[in-house]
Amino acid sequence: MARYLGPKLKLSRREGTDLFLKSGVRAIDTKCKIEQAPGQHGARKPRLSDYGVQLREKQKVRRTYGVLERQFRNYYKEAARLKGNTGENLLALLEGRLDNVVYRMGFGATRAESRQLVSHKSIMVNGRVVSIASYQVTPNDVVSIREKAKKQSRVKAALELAEQREKPTWLEVDATKMEGVFKRIPERTDLSADINEHLIVELYSK
């Protein structure tokens, strides 16, 4: 399945919630009618079955992290193999993706921009360039911007935007040095309460 390249707000409207696919901190409901589905007048949302609700939740999380369908299923399989709560394991794996960590640290304004920074070899982990967005960052790893990329205006703009967002407690960021430490794997209470990972587990358990 190819990566979606269309309007970002359309995806958020389809899921009925802000997926944080656009840069900035302004609430998405000030930009568009989030309660309406995509379309000139917004198609009336049908009443969903249990399966439909589970599918929508999976799509919402998958699109939030910018992961393709096959990748997402593989993350679920890995989460199910690990000890502990499968749903929480899934979120931890998604949060540990390098592109997501770059975004959380404020080096990219969006996850898509952060993914581009990684693929363009602008990101280092423990002093070595890593160009794979799905690379799993582990506790105590140091993530930094390469020297030649520190002057990019988009990186500076992203750091300014990040100052307006809530700072993740599981990360330690030095904006001046443009580097951060992945201190620990985030706990469920650290992450958005808007995600219902139990629905995703129910979907894949069928």
Curated annotation (Swiss-Prot):
Residue span(s) of domain S4 RNA-binding: 96-156
Molecular functions per Gene Ontology: rRNA binding; structural constituent of ribosome
Keywords noted in UniProt: Ribonucleoprotein, Ribosomal protein, RNA-binding, rRNA-binding
Any single Gene Ontology cellular-component annotation: small ribosomal subunit
Gene name tied to this protein: rpsD
Name this protein carries in UniProt: Small ribosomal subunit protein uS4
GO BP term, example: ribosomal small subunit biogenesis
CDD domains in the record: S4 (cd00165)
Keyword Magnesium appears in the UniProt entry: no
InterPro entries listed in its UniProt record: Ribosomal_uS4, Ribosomal_uS4_bac-type, Ribosomal_uS4_CS, Ribosomal_uS4_N, S4_RNA-bd, S4_RNA-bd_sf
Stated family: Belongs to the universal ribosomal protein uS4 family.
Pfam families in alphabetical order: Ribosomal_S4, S4
